[in-house]
Amino acid sequence: MEHVLGFVALAAGLIIGLGAVGACIGIGIMGSKYLEAAARQPELMNELQTKMFLLAGLIDAAFLIGVGIAMMFAFANPFVLK
């Protein structure tokens, strides 16, 4: 029983940590590509900015869904029988 709780805590930490790292890397790469594209074609900057913020929100939403799942495993653990 204690092993299950320990592994669930480890899994929740990994879900949150790796999700945060992935989201940060994704947003960083996307931001650098946006700056490259805006420097190449400044007239498209407003259209690109809208798309960039939309994608940044989607990337963050995927991370927050992972946080929600990790919190469900941590506090309402479906693997422990009561």
From Swiss-Prot:
> Which Pfam families does the protein's record reference?
ATP-synt_C
Q: What is its main location?
A: membrane
InterPro entries in the record, alphabetically? ATP_synth_csu_bac/chlpt (IPR005953), ATP_synth_F0_csu (IPR000454), ATP_synth_F0_csu_DDCD_BS (IPR020537), ATP_synth_F0_csu_sf (IPR038662), ATPase_proteolipid_c-like_dom (IPR002379), F/V-ATP_Csub_sf (IPR035921)
Residues under site feature: Reversibly protonated during proton transport: D60
Q: What are the TM regions of this chain, as residue ranges?
A: 7-27, 53-73
Where does the record say this protein resides? Cell inner membrane
Topological type in the membrane: Multi-pass membrane protein
State the protein's purpose: F(1)F(0) ATP synthase produces ATP from ADP in the presence of a proton or sodium gradient. F-type ATPases consist of two structural domains, F(1) containing the extramembraneous catalytic core and F(0) containing the membrane proton channel, linked together by a central stalk and a peripheral stalk. During catalysis, ATP synthesis in the catalytic domain of F(1) is coupled via a rotary mechanism of the central stalk subunits to proton translocation.
Q: Which family does it belong to?
A: Belongs to the ATPase C chain family.
What does the subunit comment say? F-type ATPases have 2 components, F(1) - the catalytic core - and F(0) - the membrane proton channel. F(1) has five subunits: alpha(3), beta(3), gamma(1), delta(1), epsilon(1). F(0) has three main subunits: a(1), b(2) and c(10-14). The alpha and beta chains form an alternating ring which encloses part of the gamma chain. F(1) is attached to F(0) by a central stalk formed by the gamma and epsilon chains, while a peripheral stalk is formed by the delta and b chains.
Q: What is this protein called?
A: ATP synthase subunit c
Q: Which gene encodes it?
A: atpE
